[in-house]
């Protein structure tokens, strides 16, 4: 499991940094796990150079038995009886007149639980689009009502591969609503916006990265199987937000080092965190091409011969939509995501005031998988 989690985290950071280059100061929110799962399904059907590019970009080449590892990781994350709701759903929509290889369909069903739904792209592409959107809307509890905008599929579309992820979890320690107040959030050195700032004082896993002047806080969800980890720069240092320095050093090894439990102290922390909601939408073709996936999107070069006998199929678009809402109760996220305080005068305590931009991710603790990753820059 560890190999796959490491591969997925490396890709998560690669993609985050690619998106950050295009959008150095704005909000970002993705479910890298959802994108990796969807692309692993595509990987099943790729051959030759197309497969090699995917394998390298998604770091699948570092994982033995990548598909069976995904199968067990999905089962572990989606397990019944968990104290959170997390739904990861995959589906293939294929042109009904097109012949997909039976072994490809058997593999995607067995490994990723993805059935092939036959639709009529050729004569009724708009109806097909609505059908796909309706399914995603249902899987994400209505949070992603329109994954595919008008015109995204047409009569030449052969295959749409959909992955949706939905998460809702309550904090292990909820923020009291009555403690929430209006407070300024500093976007940069000059501009501010008012946010609803939540507050609580409890024992949390907290750390400080000296050379980056950055605080780390782990907020567990009920059941402690998932946590939100926040990286907050001390202050707005650089022209943007103090995050630049952190982002420049973001690697799998560093992230692991900064956030692993043995490097954090379990102490009293005064936590101020804004209530926030992000909805983002990405067409990932150019970002993935920059990271090395090129042939897949090229009709004359794509080799998807593991999906169909004919060499006439390629992936025209990879669309990713995501949603997250963080409030006093906990977090609701989708993408298409007991310390008893005793009173003691000498107890050290720390302040964690997220009143300026920060990075955050939602992690499945036992596997170390990053399910969602984002930057909150502006309400």
Curated annotation (Swiss-Prot):
Organismal lineage: Eukaryota, Metazoa, Chordata, Craniata, Vertebrata
Chain positions found as N6-acetyllysine: 137, 177
Oligomer and partners: Monomer. Interacts (via C-terminus) with CASP1; CASP4 (via CARD domain) and CASP5; these interactions regulate the activity of inflammatory caspases. Interacts with PRTN3. Interacts with GZMH.
Tissue-level expression: In human bone marrow, present in all CD45+ populations. Expression levels are highest in the neutrophil lineage, intermediate in monocytic, and lowest in lymphocytic lineage. Within the neutrophil lineage, expression is highest in promyelocytes.
Family, similarity comment: Belongs to the serpin family. Ov-serpin subfamily.
Matching InterPro entries: Serpin_CS (IPR023795), Serpin_dom (IPR023796), Serpin_fam (IPR000215), Serpin_sf (IPR036186), Serpin_sf_1 (IPR042178), Serpin_sf_2 (IPR042185)
Gene: SERPINB1
Residues that bear Phosphoserine: 300
Source taxon at top rank: Eukaryota
Domain remark text: Reactive bond 1 is specific for reaction with chymotrypsin-like protease such as cathepsin G, chymotrypsin, chymase or granzyme H, while reactive bond 2 is specific for reaction with elastase-like protease such as neutrophil elastase, proteinase-3, pancreatic elastase or PSA.
CARD-binding motif (CBM): annotated segments: 351-379
Protein's name in the database: Leukocyte elastase inhibitor
Positions marked as site (Reactive bond 1): 343-344
GO molecular function, one term: serine-type endopeptidase inhibitor activity
Subcellular localization, as worded in the UniProt entry: Secreted; Cytoplasm; Cytolytic granule; Early endosome
Biological process annotations from GO: negative regulation of cell migration; negative regulation of endopeptidase activity; negative regulation of interleukin-1 beta production; type B pancreatic cell proliferation
Entry-annotated residues carrying N-acetylmethionine: 1
Keyword annotations from UniProtKB, A to Z: Acetylation, Cytoplasm, Endosome, Lysosome, Phosphoprotein, Protease inhibitor, Secreted, Serine protease inhibitor
Site (Reactive bond 2) residue list: 344-345
Role summary: Neutrophil serine protease inhibitor that plays an essential role in the regulation of the innate immune response, inflammation and cellular homeostasis. Acts primarily to protect the cell from proteases released in the cytoplasm during stress or infection. These proteases are important in killing microbes but when released from granules, these potent enzymes also destroy host proteins and contribute to mortality. Regulates the activity of the neutrophil proteases elastase, cathepsin G, proteinase-3, chymase, chymotrypsin, and kallikrein-3.
One cellular component (GO) term of this entry: early endosome
